[in-house]
A protein has these predicted regions:
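Short solvent-exposed coil/turn linkers within tandem alpha-helical repeat scaffolds
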Residues: 13-21, 49-58, 77, 91-108, ...
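Conserved small/polar residues in nucleotide/adenosyl-binding loops
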Residues: 211-216
Length: 216
């Protein structure tokens, strides 16, 4: 494939302005894709769609641009700029080609990328929880981070994990509160507990959940 990419780059220059230039550019993108050089492949496919928006391979180029960006996304713990770019490209593909045979695959990739973004938020919330009261009220930051993730991605596969983290953080906030805030925070924790139990009645976490009722 490396040799093919070299030859195709030369051909594109020679064939510029001819009917064969379009096909050669798409083939170049596939050559990079098959080499697993996903960043260059995506750039090449995007160049194709910009140059030949109604071209023979426009739909496939748009799809493969999104898939290449999808395959090039970083681990959840790293910066997720590439993940947002991949989502944007896949959503562009879905917008332009709503009847495509690749529609379901593209949607599945979008959902997987969104879950990666949620996982990063979950990892951040969990870190805040583990920091506890070190240099401030990290439990509150945990709650805010987890709640924002649920607001942005309400159907995420991490919904239960984020919800239990919120409940546990609220419990710790109640335990560590000053006396005048303790009763209200315990009540919030109890409300959170029942909300969790109602939404996840079969949760694996329920057997180990305990809360302390506020003193009268």
């Amino acid at each position: 494939y490396g040799r093919s990419a070299t030859l195709l780059n030369e051909l594109i220059t020679i064939l510029k302005g001819t009917d064969k230039a379009e096909e050669s550019l798409y083939m170049l993108g596939m050559s990079y894709y098959n080499q697993k050089d996903y960043s260059t492949a995506a750039q090449t496919f995007i160049t194709y769609t910009n140059t030949y928006p109604r071209g023979t391979f426009a739909e496939l180029a748009s799809y493969h641009a999104g898939k290449a960006l999808f395959l090039d996304t970083p681990e959840a713990r790293l910066d997720q700029s590439g993940t947002y770019t991949a989502i944007q490209q896949l959503q562009t593909f879905l917008e332009y080609y709503p009847a495509s045979s690749k529609k379901q695959e593209a949607q599945d990739m979008v959902f997987a990328l969104q879950d990666k973004l949620v996982l990063k938020e979950f990892m951040s919330a969990k870190l805040y929880y583990n920091l506890g009261n070190y240099m401030g009220n990290n439990y509150e930051s945990c709650v805010i981070t987890a709640q924002n993730a649920l607001k942005d991605y309400p159907y995420t596969d991490y919904r239960e994990d984020l919800s239990i983290l919120i409940l546990r953080a609220k419990y710790e906030m109640a335990v560590n509160s000053i006396e005048e805030k303790k009763i209200d925070r315990y009540r919030e924790t109890i409300d959170e507990y029942y909300a969790f139990k109602n939404e996840f009645p079969e949760s694996k976490y329920l057997s180990c959940l305990l809360y302390t009722s506020p003193s009268p």
